[in-house]
């Protein structure tokens, strides 16, 4: 097999790489300028780089690659350009002040950097100076540092000095960005100092100090503004901060107004007016324009006008950013430019500029678009867009990646052998860009259409071309080498392989071949047929190969000729194929060798312009004919060039008769023949002799100025210009000019002299040469003109006040010269009497003298003499100082201490003579200066001194003198000062500690002794630390203010049960005194903070677990360990929790005994101290060990045929482990044979075959665990029968399932024949067949399936099986578990930081409650927190709540099914309210002249700790408040440093967590003599004419409007009240109807006796309640708030039977003993959500707090239960003459005499007057421990249908008409509580029960309905059983009874009832018995047993209470 693949590619320059990681980039693209000092040199790294490493080169801007100049310039291998330090004489513009650029090149391409201007700065001397300034006191002064223009660009101001002290920008001194010094609010003393600026050269680092300047300060005088600082133009880049100075001097202070482009400028945002002028932040180009600063006051105006130029930085961006294309495609690039306009844009490719050409187009505005067509591979690389404007430039680049679009073979056919007539398909898969064209050949012959070959192709989704060649029936001639060729503009690729067709071998005729000499040639032998033996080649009968250039491939018949030679290789070649050993065939081919041309190399010699050129191109070898052509620069030579070409045979000549510059270029000679085309290229360079473009001419130069001597020339090569100089005007003797920093040659050849001096005058010669032709030169004469200059003058001079002074200056320059004298800015005229000016000429100089007669202080300052001529002006500044004795210093107190006083003085005018010393005098205030203590000759360098050894609090007088060389000053101002206080010398007294809690200690103490206080005690520092005898702990310090002589402070957040040491220190203004003696105490004990660790539990037996744990550390105990408590409970299999138990021990281990076998237990351990239980540990789980199981719970056996029986059983009730198997025993007595059969643990039936017919067998079953066999079940007998009756092996029982699951009820029946099975469900006591639908079906095995089980699927199901011989039935009780109902959540107790919640669980949904989730949120907050709560809990206390804050709560119960409904949101508020100030307390304790003591005891914290105390005060009529903010409130607070005899405003703000309170007050300090000042008077000024008519009318209209408004408000209140009443009545009626609807629609049928019915609950909102119960000896007040639950069944029954009073009895589980208040409702809000609270009706205003009062007495143990009666105010039916006795029931009913009744019962508190209060009291009465076994009777009032105000109860003879105070809305009229039943007496021997009140002591309120369905329960005996069964099993029927079942009264009950009542009861009982269905006694007993759970059923029994249609009573048991 063979495969030959050849690739032919076009020839491209290898300048591009497709390496994926090849890239170029810039490391510092912003580098555009490098300035350096000539003395230091510089290193300039190339800004470009790349990966892989790049080649870096540097070029001049002209494109010339730079070269190393030893010692001057060097390019390092890493591309860094170094310029070496050099002296000024070696300065070269070409090197040291030129533009460079750098290139980086790698296979990715080539990029060039932006132009980098490199400039060397020569070191030249310069001076900076500052001029004296004038200003007015209180105004602004501006000093400027004047820098010479020659160095201004390099020198910056770094600081200013005042005398020798550096100034920093601050409140009064400001240094601007331009280096100016601003002095704000100038004072006289500012004129006493010298000011100078310090500059630094940016590049040389040299610093210069200016001369000293003075500030002359004058008194303010009215004057027009004069500009001190301004600007004429500013340049900035966008984004920079711009400062435009504008400052003027004037009085009054002038106003500033800014205009931009003649429009007022709005000063806001980015534009800000500052002290210095205008500040522009983040400048923009739009900010450019003309700015005017107008300065004006009432005396005149001034302006500063300037322009601002904000330039946008140039930025170029090329898009697209990534260019990836292919060869032959078009590429378009766009360059977007931001920044200045009119910029120049150019394109570069690989560092070379791009010009428009054949395939290159540059279009768009400013040439922004580059379009390149027909891209070739050399076009790839880096493309750059350069933008240039002035000296700014920017660039961007992008790499253009050209993919190799050369075709590539992806997959192709392979060599194969086929048989004749066999179809052949060849495939060639090719890719390339552009899409290649595929052609096919067979043995180098094209395959044509119709030749038996079919060619087709397709393009895949990947862009590949797939070409197919198909041969439907191959023949021998179809064999050969097939080649597929793919061709596109990028290249060609081919693939070939041989296809052999079996058949006789032969050779297809071969075509002659033409070979090219010097190249390789392949000759293929075109063999067809297969197989054959060999292929051989011959030439001239010689077997090939016979030399090294010949290679014969015998396997495929190919001959290769390398480096073909015409003489050797041309000729006949024969291919011989050996077909059989003795048979061969052959074919010959002729090879002709063609020789390509070879051009003899030629080069252009050096030619000059105008010469003639003749260049021959000779082809020295190659086959004829040969064609020769010429090209210039790659294109045909245009005829316009005048070039002549002569061709003769194998030669061609190029002739140019007259050379010019346009002939420059590359000339190429191209020779072609049949073999090839070759070329040779040479460059023609035409040289041009130099000539002048600008010739030098005579010029004048001004001394000190710059001059340019023009001279420029052109030529090729670029000519060199050399300058020479001949000094003077004589015969020129030219010498080369030494170039330096002052004299430079410009790039155009001109000569620059930066600073002309007199020696520069003379002849200058400009010589131009370029080695082409003769040099040219031209001379010129430079004349130097000298401007007027001051050559001599004194810089400074001194004069003595009152004496004569002369000053002179000398001028030099071109005559005539005028000299003028100035003083400051005033010209000195001859009219000035004290000044005399004289001038004289001495040679070339002019001397001028100024005389002053005599000198005064004002003569001090700067005088200047000005010299002026035609060429310039100069001036000399002379500083005259007039000396005199100094002014006295201004002294002030710098620091006062207890025993030292430090003075500070400011020296006034020093008399222009240095101060030589100071004298200080100090005396007691009462002494004379003669006895003063003096300190002389204090150093003049000092400006402060300290006086020592003074007495604290003593008063002294101090003054001082200044001295200089001239004399002594007058005495200074006299100051009087009192020494400071000293720190206390004694500790606080009587320090006592008292622990108040486990984390707090109360500290009390008294102030130090008076004589040791050393001032006013202002506060104390308390230091405390944990006390340790061996430790050295640092004290924690707390600072507090003083409140009086005795202090109290409580330390909080301390460690529990920890010993602390404490000290107290007193503080005054001077500091802190000594500490008190350290006192030790210990915080109180607390519960442990952490649980025991490492709790481990191991099961030791089936009934015991061993537990161990680690003891707690001392830090975690928080007290003395009393022991450990282990809490444990069983986790039952069904997910329920067992009883929670706990065991106490003192050891860290415990053995739990008596546990359930093989049961998983949850275990927690806690430690407890004397303070209580600590934190429980995390639950751990341990299972007891296995034991032998109990007996199976049941066994059944039934005959299935004559020889086979089935046995079924139930698992043991006590598994005691994992059941491994069951063993079934079968035996018969005759003979005794016991057979054992094993069944798997998950099997509960077994088939026993092969039994004898009609023989009885004994069967029993045993369960087996890993511990062994358990006890056997009961033994049953069974007999195989041929006619086996139907029997059911499944057991009856209860099936429990969660809702929404699929449930299968099994019913396995056996018998012979097989029995039929049917299912029925008990419906209202009557079984009926189950409904078969999509949710219910019966399997073939008899099982009944219910899918997605629901609550209504609960009930009793019967499975009946029967056949011909018998039947059987089982009953399955299906219980469906649902999520639990919502709990009933109430608030039971509140404190200032905690809220205790209690709840009653709702219906558990058939599954025990697993836990609760309590959620809470602070009011007005959307954030909710949550707590998981144990299922056994019924209350929860939330700690660490905010005081006086409302909170919202919800509770959710969870059972095995999931979470239930969320309870209603209830709200509660922690105790506390905002602070308030007591009116009985006086705010101001004491007031004197400068101090006020505030009495803060009057602030009541409202029960919540004060969190902040803010006090502000200010003098009356001012706007600035003085603030004192504290976090704690002390007893008193002292305001210090007040102004005497001043009225003050005072406002206080005190806050706690409940809110804030404010208090305002005014007070006045006393006069200095202790007298008071006049009070504040607000005067009202009224005109004498009195009120006008219009004013009187206005008052009348105002009063009328107020009266009308009050009237409207009163009417509105009446309407709102009536509407609220109507809405309230409507809501109650709606609640009634809703309850009836819920009763009828939402009743959940319950077939399970142990489960209470599920009902929809409604929330009841009861804001307040009050319950009154008297006790004979004591009275206890219990605050209460609760929620009432009534049921819709009750409400509905009441609606149906209004004429009856129905009593319901409910079992209620007792709660724990309560000894304190049940709940505090003083801050309760109505409603369970914020909207309800806001809309609730306000309660009675007469009382602020409600009390629930219980009167409890202890019953005698032998007292029997009393009869419960409804205790209406109606007369009780009795015999005539009977005496009323107080009822033994607890009753509350409406009272007519409300005021009298309440007063007699509640003392000063009002009794309840609303239904809500009684309903809440009733709810919590049920929860009281004392009433756990009491009976409650409720009488409920309903709305009268007749809307009557009178409620009637019974007949007329029993009617008691209620007054209008009786409520006309529904509610509980009363409820009563009676002692327990006799059988409960033993359990309540020591329990208190309530005593009933009189009928008049009643409280009334309406009911809020929340319905629970109530089930009836009968009385003992037949009627009771029937009632119970009816209520539990047939609830629907129980509601259809005409009358409820009533119990017969007990003897005690009968004694309290009337005869008519008993008759009514008997008649009702008869009716009830007649209608009740009969049930089996066992079932009723079971039902009674189930109903005793905590969620007990409610039963109804009636008591006939007369004919009152609006009352019914409820009795709860």
UniProtKB/Swiss-Prot annotation:
Residues in compartment: Extracellular: 19-1594
Alphabetical GO biological process terms: axon guidance; camera-type eye photoreceptor cell differentiation; central nervous system development; dendrite morphogenesis; dendrite self-avoidance; dendritic spine development; homophilic cell adhesion via plasma membrane adhesion molecules; locomotory behavior
Disulfide bonds: 46-102, 145-197, 246-293, 335-385, 428-484, 525-575, 617-669, 711-766, 809-865, 1307-1359
Purpose: Cell adhesion molecule that plays a role in neuronal self-avoidance. Promotes repulsion between specific neuronal processes of either the same cell or the same subtype of cells. Mediates within retinal amacrine and ganglion cell subtypes both isoneuronal self-avoidance for creating an orderly dendritic arborization and heteroneuronal self-avoidance to maintain the mosaic spacing between amacrine and ganglion cell bodies. Receptor for netrin required for axon guidance independently of and in collaboration with the receptor DCC.
Gene this chain is encoded by: Dscam
Taxonomic placement: Eukaryota, Metazoa, Chordata, Craniata, Vertebrata
Signal peptide, first to last residue: 1-17
Comp. bias intervals (Polar residues): 1949-1968
Chain intervals for the UniProt region annotation (Required for netrin-mediated axon repulsion of neuronal growth cones): 1616-2013
Top-level taxon in the UniProt lineage: Eukaryota
Disordered, as annotated region: 1718-1809, 1920-2013
Gene Ontology molecular function: cell-cell adhesion mediator activity; netrin receptor binding; protein tyrosine kinase binding
The protein, known as: Cell adhesion molecule DSCAM
Stretches assigned to the Cytoplasmic side: 1616-2013
Membrane topology note: Single-pass type I membrane protein
Glycosylation sites: 78, 470, 666, 1160, 1250
């Amino acid at each position: 097999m063979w495969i030959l693949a050849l690739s032919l590619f076009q020839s491209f320059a290898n300048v591009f790489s497709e390496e994926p990681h090849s890239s170029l980039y810039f490391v510092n693209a912003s580098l555009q300028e490098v300035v350096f000092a000539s003395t230091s040199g510089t290193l300039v790294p190339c800004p470009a780089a790349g990966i892989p490493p790049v080649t870096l080169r540097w070029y001049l801007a002209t494109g010339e690659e730079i070269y190393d100049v030893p010692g001057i310039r060097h390019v390092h291998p890493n591309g860094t350009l170094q310029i070496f330090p050099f002296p000024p004489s070696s300065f070269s513009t070409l090197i040291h002040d030129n533009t460079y650029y750098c290139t980086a090149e790698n296979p990715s391409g080539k990029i060039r950097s932006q132009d980098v201007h490199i400039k060397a700065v020569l070191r030249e001397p310069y001076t900076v100076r500052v001029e004296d300034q004038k200003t007015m006191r209180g105004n602004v002064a501006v000093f400027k540092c004047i820098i010479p223009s020659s160095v201004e660009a390099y020198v910056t101001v770094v600081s200013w000095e005042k005398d020798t002290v550096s100034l920093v920008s601050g409140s009064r001194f400001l240094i601007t960005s331009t280096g100016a010094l601003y002095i704000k609010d100038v004072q006289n003393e500012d004129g006493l100092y010298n000011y100078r600026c310090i500059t630094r050269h940016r590049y040389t680092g040299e610093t210069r100090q200016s001369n000293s300047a003075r500030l002359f300060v004058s008194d303010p005088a009215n004057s027009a503004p004069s500009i001190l600082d301004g600007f004429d133009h500013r340049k900035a880049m966008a984004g920079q901060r711009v400062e435009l100075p504008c400052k003027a001097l004037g009085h009054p202070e002038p106003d500033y107004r800014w205009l931009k482009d003649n429009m007022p400028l709005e000063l806001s945002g980015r534009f800000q007016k500052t002290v210095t002028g205008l500040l522009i932040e983040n400048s923009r180009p739009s900010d450019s324009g003309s700015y005017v600063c107008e300065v004006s006051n009432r005396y005149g105006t001034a302006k500063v006008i300037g322009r601002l130029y904000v330039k946008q930085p140039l930025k170029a961006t090329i898009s697209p950013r990534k260019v990836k294309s292919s060869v032959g495609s078009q590429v378009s690039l766009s360059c977007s430019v931001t920044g200045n306009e009119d910029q120049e844009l150019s394109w570069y490719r690989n560092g070379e500029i791009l010009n428009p050409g054949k395939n290159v187009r540059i279009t768009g505005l400013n040439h922004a678009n580059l379009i390149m067509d027909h891209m070739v591979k050399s076009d790839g690389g880096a493309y750059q867009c350069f933008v240039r404007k002035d000296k700014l430039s920017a660039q961007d680049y992008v790499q253009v990646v050209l993919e190799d679009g050369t075709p590539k073979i992806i997959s192709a056919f392979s060599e194969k052998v086929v048989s004749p007539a066999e179809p052949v398909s060849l495939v060639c898969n090719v890719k390339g860009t552009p899409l290649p064209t595929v052609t096919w050949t067979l043995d180098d012959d094209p395959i044509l259409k119709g030749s038996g070959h079919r060619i087709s192709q397709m393009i895949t989704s990947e862009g590949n071309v797939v070409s197919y060649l198909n041969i439907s029936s191959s023949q021998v001639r179809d064999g050969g080498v097939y080649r597929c060729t793919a061709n596109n503009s990028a290249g060609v690729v081919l693939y070939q392989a041989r296809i052999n067709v079996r058949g006789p071998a032969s050779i297809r005729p071969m075509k002659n071949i033409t070979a090219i000499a010097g190249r390789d040639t392949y000759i293929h032998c075109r063999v067809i047929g297969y197989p054959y033996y060999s292929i051989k080649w011959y030439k001239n009968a010689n077997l090939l190969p016979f030399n090294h250039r010949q290679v014969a491939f015998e396997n495929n018949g190919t001959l290769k000729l390398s480096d073909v030679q015409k003489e050797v290789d041309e000729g006949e070649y024969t291919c011989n194929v050996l077909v059989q050993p003795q048979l061969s065939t052959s074919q010959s081919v002729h090879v002709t060798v063609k020789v390509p041309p070879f051009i003899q190399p030629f080069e252009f010699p050096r030619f000059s312009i105008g010469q003639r050129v003749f260049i021959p191109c000779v082809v020295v070898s190659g086959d004829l004919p040969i064609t020769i052509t010429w090209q210039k620069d790659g294109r045909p030579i245009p005829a316009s060039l005048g070039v002549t070409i002569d061709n003769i045979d194998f030669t061609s000549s190029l002739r140019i008769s007259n050379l010019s510059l346009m002939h420059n270029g590359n000339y190429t000679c191209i020779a072609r023949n049949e073999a090839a085309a070759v070329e040779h290229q040479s460059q023609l360079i035409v040289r041009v002799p130099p000539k002048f473009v600008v010739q030098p001419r005579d010029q004048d130069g001004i001394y000190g100025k710059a001059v340019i001597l023009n001279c420029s020339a052109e030529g090729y090569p670029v000519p060199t210009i050399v300058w020479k100089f001949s000094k003077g005007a004589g015969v020129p003797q030219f010498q080369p000019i030494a170039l330096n920093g002052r004299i430079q040659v410009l790039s155009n050849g001109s000569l620059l002299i930066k600073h002309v001096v007199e020696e520069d005058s003379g002849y200058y010669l400009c010589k131009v040469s370029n080695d082409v032709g003769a040099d040219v030169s031209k001379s010129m004469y430079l004349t130097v003109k000298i401007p007027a200059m001051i050559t001599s003058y004194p810089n400074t001079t001194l004069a003595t006040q009152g004496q004569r002074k002369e000053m002179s200056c000398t001028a030099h320059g071109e005559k005539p010269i005028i000299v003028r004298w100035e003083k400051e800015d005033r010209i000195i005229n001859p009219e000035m009497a004290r000044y005399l000016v004289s001038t004289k000429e001495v040679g070339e100089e002019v001397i001028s003298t100024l005389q002053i007669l005599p000198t005064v202080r004002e003569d001090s300052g700067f005088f200047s003499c000005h010299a002026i001529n035609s060429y310039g002006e100069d001036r000399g500044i002379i500083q005259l100082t007039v000396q005199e004795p100094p002014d006295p210093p201004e002294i002030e107190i710098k620091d006062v201490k207890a025993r030292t006083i430090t003075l500070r003085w400011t020296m006034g005018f020093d008399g222009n003579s240095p101060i030589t010393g100071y004298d200080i005098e100090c005396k007691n205030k009462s002494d004379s200066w003669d006895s003063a203590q003096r300190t002389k000759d204090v150093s003049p360098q000092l400006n402060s001194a300290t006086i020592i050894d003074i007495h604290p609090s003593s008063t002294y007088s101090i003054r001082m003198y200044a001295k200089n060389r001239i004399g002594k000053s007058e005495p200074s101002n006299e100051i009087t000062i009192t020494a400071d206080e000293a720190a206390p010398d004694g500790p606080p007294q009587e320090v006592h500690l008292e622990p108040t809690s486990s984390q707090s200690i109360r500290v009390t103490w008294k102030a130090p002794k008076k004589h040791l206080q050393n001032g006013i005690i202002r506060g104390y520092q308390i230091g405390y630390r944990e006390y340790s005898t061996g430790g050295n702990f640092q004290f924690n310090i707390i600072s507090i203010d003083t409140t009086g002589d005795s202090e109290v402070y409580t330390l909080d957040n301390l460690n529990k049960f920890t010993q602390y040491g404490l000290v107290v220190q007193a503080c005054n203004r001077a500091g802190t005194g000594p500490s008190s003696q350290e006192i030790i105490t210990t915080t109180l004990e607390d519960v442990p903070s952490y649980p025991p660790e490492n709790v481990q539990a191991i099961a030791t037996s089936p009934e015991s677990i061993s537990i161990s744990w680690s003891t707690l550390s001392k830090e975690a105990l928080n007290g003395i360990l009393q022991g450990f408590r282990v809490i444990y409970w069983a986790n039952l299999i069904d997910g329920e929790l067992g009883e929670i138990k706990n065991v106490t021990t003192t050891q860290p281990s415990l053995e739990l005994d008596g546990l359930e076998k093989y049961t998983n237990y949850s275990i927690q351990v806690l430690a407890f101290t004397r303070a209580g239980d600590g934190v429980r540990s995390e639950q751990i789980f341990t299972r007891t060990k296995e034991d032998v199981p109990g007996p199976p719970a049941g066994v059944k056996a039934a005959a299935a045929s004559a020889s086979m029986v089935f046995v079924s059983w139930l698992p043991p009730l006590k598994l005691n482990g994992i059941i491994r198997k069951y063993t079934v025993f079968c035996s018969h007595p005759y003979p005794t044979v016991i057979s054992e059969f094993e069944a798997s643990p998950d099997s509960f039936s077994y088939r026993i075959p092969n039994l004898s017919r009609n023989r009885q067998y004994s069967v029993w079953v045993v369960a087996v665990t890993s511990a062994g066999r358990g006890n056997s079940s009961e033994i049953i007998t069974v007999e195989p029968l041929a006619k086996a009756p139907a029997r059911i092996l499944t057991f009856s029982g209860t099936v429990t399932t969660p809702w929404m699951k699929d449930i299968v009820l099994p019913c396995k029946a056996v018998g012979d024949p097989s029995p039929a099975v049917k299912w029925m469900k008990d419906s209202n006591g009557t079984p009926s067949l189950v409904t078969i639908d999509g949710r219910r079906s019966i399997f073939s095995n008899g099982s009944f399936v219910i899918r997605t089980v629901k609550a209504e699927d609960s009930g009793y199901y019967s499975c009946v099986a029967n056949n011909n011989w018998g039947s059987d039935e089982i009953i399955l009780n299906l219980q469906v578990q649902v999520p639990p109902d919502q709990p009933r959540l109430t608030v039971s107790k509140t404190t200032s930081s905690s809220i205790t919640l209690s709840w009653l669980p709702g219906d558990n949904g058939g599954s025990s409650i697993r836990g609760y989730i309590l959620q809470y949120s602070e009011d007005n907050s959307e954030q909710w927190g949550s707590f998981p709560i144990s299922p056994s809990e019924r209350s929860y206390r939330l700690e660490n709540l905010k005081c006086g804050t409302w909170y919202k709560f919800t509770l959710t119960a969870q059972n095995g099914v999931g979470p239930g409904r969320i309870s209603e949101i209830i709200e509660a508020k922690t105790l506390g309210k905002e602070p308030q100030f007591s009116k009985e307390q006086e705010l101001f304790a004491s007031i004197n002249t400068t101090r006020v003591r505030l009495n803060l005891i009057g602030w009541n914290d409202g029960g919540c700790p004060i969190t902040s105390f803010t006090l502000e005060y200010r003098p009356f009529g001012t706007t600035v408040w003085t603030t004192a903010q504290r976090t704690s409130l002390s007893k008193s607070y002292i305001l210090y440093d007040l102004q005497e005899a001043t009225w003050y405003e005072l406002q206080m703000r005190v806050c706690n967590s409940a809110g804030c309170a404010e208090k305002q007050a005014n007070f006045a300090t006393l006069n200095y003599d202790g007298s008071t000042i006049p009070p504040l008077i607000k005067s009202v000024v009224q005109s004498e004419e009195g009120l006008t008519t219009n004013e009187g009318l206005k008052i009348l209209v105002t009063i009328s409007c107020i009266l009308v408004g009050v009237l409207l408000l009163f009417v509105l209140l009446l309407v709102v009240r009536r509407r609220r009443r109507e809405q309230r009545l409507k809501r109650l009626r709606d609640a009634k109807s809703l309850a009836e609807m819920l009763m009828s629609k939402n009743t959940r049928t319950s077939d399970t006796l142990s489960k209470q019915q599920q009902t929809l609950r409604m929330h009841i909102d009861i804001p307040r309640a009050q319950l009154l119960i008297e006790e004979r000896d004591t009275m206890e007040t219990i605050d209460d708030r609760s929620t009432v639950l009534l049921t819709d069944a009750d409400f509905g029954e009441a609606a149906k039977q209004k004429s009856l009073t129905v009593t319901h009895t409910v079992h209620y589980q007792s709660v724990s003993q309560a000894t304190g208040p049940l709940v505090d409702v003083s801050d309760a809000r109505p409603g369970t959500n914020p909207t309800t609270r806001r809309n609730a009706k306000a309660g009675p205003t007469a009382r602020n707090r409600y009390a629930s009062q219980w009167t409890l007495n202890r019953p005698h143990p032998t007292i029997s239960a009393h009869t419960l009666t409804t205790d209406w105010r109606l007369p009780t039916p009795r015999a005539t003459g009977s005496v009323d006795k107080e009822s033994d029931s607890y009753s509350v009913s409406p009272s007519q005499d409300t005021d009298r009744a309440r007063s007699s019962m509640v003392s000063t508190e009002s009794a309840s007057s609303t239904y809500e209060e009684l309903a809440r009291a009733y709810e919590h009465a049920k929860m009281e421990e004392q009433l756990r076994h009491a009976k409650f009777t409720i009488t409920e009032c309903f709305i009268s249908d007749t809307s009557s105000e009178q409620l009637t109860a019974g007949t007329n003879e029993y009617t008691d008409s209620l007054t209008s105070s009786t409520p006309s809305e529904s509610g509980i009229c009363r409820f009563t509580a009676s002692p327990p039943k006799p059988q409960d007496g033993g359990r309540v021997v020591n329990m208190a029960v309530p005593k009933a009140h009189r009928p008049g002591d009643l409280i009334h309120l309406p009911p809020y309905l929340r319905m629970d369905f109530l089930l009836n329960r009968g009385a003992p005996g037949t009627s009771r059983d029937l009632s119970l069964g009816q209520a539990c099993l047939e609830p629907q029927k129980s509601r259809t009874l005409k009358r409820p079942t009533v119990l017969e009264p007990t003897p005690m009950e009968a004694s309290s009832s009337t005869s008519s009542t008993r008759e009514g009861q008997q008649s009702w009982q008869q009716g009830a018995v007649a209608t009740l269905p009969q049930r089996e006694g066992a079932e009723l007993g079971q039902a009674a047993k189930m109903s005793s759970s905590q969620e007990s059923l409610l039963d109804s029994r009636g008591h006939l209470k007369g004919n009152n249609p609006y009352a019914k009573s409820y009795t709860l048991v």
